[in-house]
Amino acid sequence: MKKFLTLLLAAFVAVSALSFTACGNKKDENKIYVGMECGYAPFNYTQTDSSNGAVKISNANGYANGYDVMIAKKIAEKLGKELVIVKYEFKGLIPAVQSGALDFIIAGMSPTAERKESIDFSDAYYQSQLVIVVKKGSKFASATNLDGFKGAKIAAQIGTFHNDALQAQAAAHGILAQTPMATFPILIGALKAGTIDGYVAEYPGAKADCTMNDTLTFVNLQNNTTGFTATDEDVQIAIGLKKGSEYLTSINAALAEISQSERDQMMQTATENAPKEG
């Protein structure tokens, strides 16, 4: 009986993670439900109030802000719907869209070939470089290419292209690829503690992390030359939707109205407004 109750409780907890919008008849058709981690600055992060246009997180404490939130607000406005931000672990985002719990993923997600097998993606709304964040003063801080990280213990976030690239390419450069970690705050903590020598991030994320943490810096690698081998789709950021979603055309139309200069300004603002951790 005890084992049965334990299994039942585990099942209840798993279902509860999706219960907010898991049943289609519980979703308000006047709202769009957008999933993100709320912990991947400057794309998305959590703050304590609604300043700078932040949106209340529907299923957790705090308010969401960042580049992804700015994009989500423009999409909601274009669709004439109220924006609902739902916090998810990164690995749970695709299943949530597939189940209908979420309408969209706007979470700094790359439209990789593997992910396209599971969900559809919009046109790209950002494109970046993969870099490596290290401690200031570290012997690896002066590296100019991946070979400069020989012997370094480098990690990345689980379920990301960052980790795919690291695991596939580390050995060729003498890098010691570590077990992937769940979130960027965990990666930052591991780096500060000396458990790892660095972690893979995208340029804007690395810039924000180093702005928030003044003991960190990053090595500005360039894809396919001094850095990781990557295709355009690997380092593009796009909106994830359920296969065959009716929203795809409207989302692409909304994105097309956002100029490159406006996107650059949005990213700069998101980076500047990210909470400083010290």
Describe these PLM feature segments:
Residues 19-22:
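C-terminal motif of bacterial Sec signal peptides marking the signal peptidase cleavage site
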Residues 24-26:
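Bacterial signal peptide processing site
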Residues 29-108:
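Extracytoplasmic small-molecule ligand-binding "clamshell" domains
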Residues 38-41, 61-77, 109, 129-185, ...:
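Bilobed "Venus flytrap"/periplasmic-binding protein-like clamshell domains
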Residues 73, 77, 82-148, 225-231:
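Acidic, polar ligand-binding/catalytic clefts
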Residues 91-92, 108-118, 164-169, 192-193, ...:
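A ligand-binding cleft/hinge motif common to bilobed small-molecule-binding domains
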Residues 161-181, 252-278:
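Ligand-binding clefts/hinges and TM-proximal coupling segments of bilobed small-molecule sensing domains
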